[in-house]
Amino acid sequence: MKQFEEQIERFKQALFEDSDASDSDSSIGEALTNRGLKRKKGSKNVYYGCVGNSSGSSIDIDYYNIGNTKRGVVSHFRRRIDPEWLDHDNPYNDINIAEIMSPLTKPQDLLTHPAISSIFEQNYLSILASSALEIISAEHKYTAHLEQLMVALLGDDPSLPGPPHEVFGISPEQCRELTITVQEALEKSKEFIRCWTNVRMDLLRAIRFKNKVIAYCQGEDYNGNTQVLSKNESDGKPNS
C-alpha cells in the first residue's frame, strides 16, 4: 500500500513540475525543429510545421478575422505591378485553376481535360483486375489441396486402399476433429474465392464502362464503329 501511495505522489509531482524542464543548460534557440535537440530547453514547443520558434517568432504573421475564425497569413504574393515581381517566384505559376475547374462543354473535351483525362488514361483498374485474378488462382490451388485431403479423410478416393484393420496413424477421434477443421477451412476458402470473384467482376464492369465512355468521346459507338455526332452533341448541347 505504501509503495502504491509513493507512486501516486510521483505522478502528482510530474503533473505540477515545469513542462519545459530539461537536464540541459542550453536552449534550442532559433531551431525550427527539435530533431536531435529534444533534451534542450524549449524543445517541447518546437515541432514540424510550427511557424516560428520557441523563443519567439522571427516571422511576421498577419492575422485576419474570416467569419468566426482567426487566420494567420505568413506571407503575401507581391503584386504584379511590383517591378521585382517574377512569375517563377510564384509557386502556383504553373497551375491554371480556371482550366482545371472548367466543366466539359462537349464529349471530346474528356480526352484532353487536365483534371479528368488522366482518370481514363491510367490503367489502374486493369492492374487491380489482374491482381484479383492472381489471388483467385492462388486460392483455387489451395482449395484443390484441401478437397484432396477431405476426400482422403472421408475415404471416398477409389484409388486409395481400404483402411487397415489396425490403427497405425491417427485415432478415429483425431480423424474426426481433423475432418471438421478441414471442412471449415474449405468453406472459408470457397467464400474467399466468391468474394474476390465479385470484386473482379465489378472491376471488369468498370473497365467496360470506361471503355464505352472513351469510345463515345472518340466518336465511336459501343462496338468500335465510327459514328458521326450531331452538331448539338459535338457542341455539348442536348438534342431537341
From Swiss-Prot:
Phenotypic consequence of gene deletion: Leads to sensitivity to camptothecin, thiabendazole, DNA damaging agents and microtubule depolymerizing drugs.
Location(s) in or outside the cell: Nucleus
GO terms of biological process kind: regulation of transcription by RNA polymerase II; transcription initiation-coupled chromatin remodeling
Keywords of this entry: Chromatin regulator, Nucleus, Repressor, Transcription, Transcription regulation
The protein's role, per its UniProt record: Component of the RPD3C(L) histone deacetylase complex (HDAC) responsible for the deacetylation of lysine residues on the N-terminal part of the core histones (H2A, H2B, H3 and H4). Histone deacetylation gives a tag for epigenetic repression and plays an important role in transcriptional regulation, cell cycle progression and developmental events.
PANTHER family membership: TRANSCRIPTIONAL REGULATORY PROTEIN RXT2
Stated name of the protein: Transcriptional regulatory protein rxt2
Species annotation: Schizosaccharomyces pombe (strain 972 / ATCC 24843) (Fission yeast)
